[in-house]
C-alpha cells in the first residue's frame, strides 16, 4: 500500500498543485526539508514516503529470496525492485520539469507497473501458503428474504423485493458520481440542474427495478433450487410470472421516459443497461460461463456513463474511466458472494468460478481484481483532477478492502467471505461519495 499511496498522491491535484513549488531534486530550491508552505510539505512528504517505500520494496525482495518463495513470486518482486530506481529517476525529471506531461505519464505508468508486480506477488504468496489447505466447513445455507422492509404489507413487500432495492443505493451513487465528474466539464455560466439529477436518478431507480424484476422472472426455476432464493415472490407464487413481467415492463417504460426527458442518448444507455442485465447476463452469460461475473460487470458500469451523458449529452473520458473502475471492481466484489454461496450456486446450475475452478483460484482472482480496481482509481484521479479527499479515501478504504481479502485467504469460511464482500461495498460507496464531494464541494 506504500507504493499505492505514492501513486495516488502523485496522480491527484494535491501533488500536481505543489509541483511548481519545488522544481529541483533531490533538494528543494537548494534547501532540505523546507516546510514553509503546504505545497512544500506535500513535496517533502511525497519524497520521504518514496524513500521509505523503496526500503520496503528492497525488504520484500530480500525476504522473497531468503525465505524460499516460489520462482514466480521472486520474479515479480525482483521486477518491482528493478523498476523502482527507474521510477525515482523519472520522478526527479518530473519534478524538475514542473510536471510536464510526458514525464508525468511515464511516471504514472511505471508506478502502476510496480504496484501490479507487488499485487501479483502477494496473490501468489497467499496462494502458495493457503491454496492447498481445505476451506473451513461451511455452515448450513442461511435463508433470508432478498430485500424489502418486513413492516410492509405482504403484496407490497413482494413487489418491492422484485425491484432488488439493495442494489439501488450503490448504482445510484455510481450515476451520481458520473454526473458530478461531468459537471466539471460544463462551461462558464452552466451548472448541473436539479431536474437533471432527479430525472437521472429516478430513471436509474426504475431501470434497476425493471432489470431486477426481469431477473426474478427469468431465473425462477434456478431460484427454486437455491436456499438463498427459494422464497422469492415469483418462486412462491406470491406474484405470478405474468404479473411480474408486466410490472417490469411498466418500470422499464417509465425509466426510459425519465431518461428521455434528460436526453436521447441517456435513454439509449438506459435501455442498453436493462437489456444487458436481463438478457445478456441473466440468460446468456450466467448459466453458461464462469466469466459471467467479469463480463457482467458492464451492467454495473453503465450507470457511470448514464450519469456523465445526462450532464454533457455525450460520452466522455471521465465517464468511461469511472465505468472502468466499476467494471474491474465487480469481480473483486461478487466473487466473495460466489464463495459464500458456492454450494447454492452449484445447485442452481450456475458455473461460477468457485464452482468450476475452485475456491483457491477464486480467492486469488479477488486479489488480482482489487489491485486492478485500485490502479484504475489512480487513473481516474489523474484524468479528472480529483483531490486529497479522494486520495485519502481510496488509500484507506483500499487498504481495508485488501486486508479483508487477505483474511479470506487465511480463514476460508463464509463469514470471512461476507466480511470481504461488505468491505468491497464500503470501498466503492465511500469512493463514490468522495468523487461527489471532491468535485462538487471541496
From Swiss-Prot:
Pfam families: UbiA. It comes from Halobacterium salinarum (strain ATCC 700922 / JCM 11081 / NRC-1) (Halobacterium halobium). It comes from the Archaea. It is an enzyme of class 2 (transferase). In the C-terminal section; belongs to the UbiA prenyltransferase family. Protoheme IX farnesyltransferase subfamily. The keyword Cell membrane applies. GO terms for cellular component: plasma membrane. Keywords: Cell membrane, Heme biosynthesis, Membrane, Transferase, Transmembrane, Transmembrane helix. Converts heme B (protoheme IX) to heme O by substitution of the vinyl group on carbon 2 of heme B porphyrin ring with a hydroxyethyl farnesyl side group. It is a multi-pass membrane protein. The gene is ctaB. Its EC number is 2.5.1.141. It is found in: Cell membrane. The keyword Cell membrane applies. Residues 168-439 are annotated as: Prenyltransferase. GO terms for molecular function: protoheme IX farnesyltransferase activity. Its main location: membrane. Pathway: Porphyrin-containing compound metabolism; heme O biosynthesis; heme O from protoheme: step 1/1. The chain crosses the membrane at residues 49-69, 76-96, 106-126, 167-187, 194-214, 245-265, 267-287, 308-328, 365-385, 386-406, 421-441. GO terms for biological process: heme biosynthetic process; heme O biosynthetic process. PANTHER family: PROTOHEME IX FARNESYLTRANSFERASE, MITOCHONDRIAL. Carbon 2 of the heme B porphyrin ring is defined according to the Fischer nomenclature. This is Protoheme IX farnesyltransferase. Residues 1-167 are annotated as: Unknown. It catalyses: heme b + (2E,6E)-farnesyl diphosphate + H2O = Fe(II)-heme o + diphosphate.
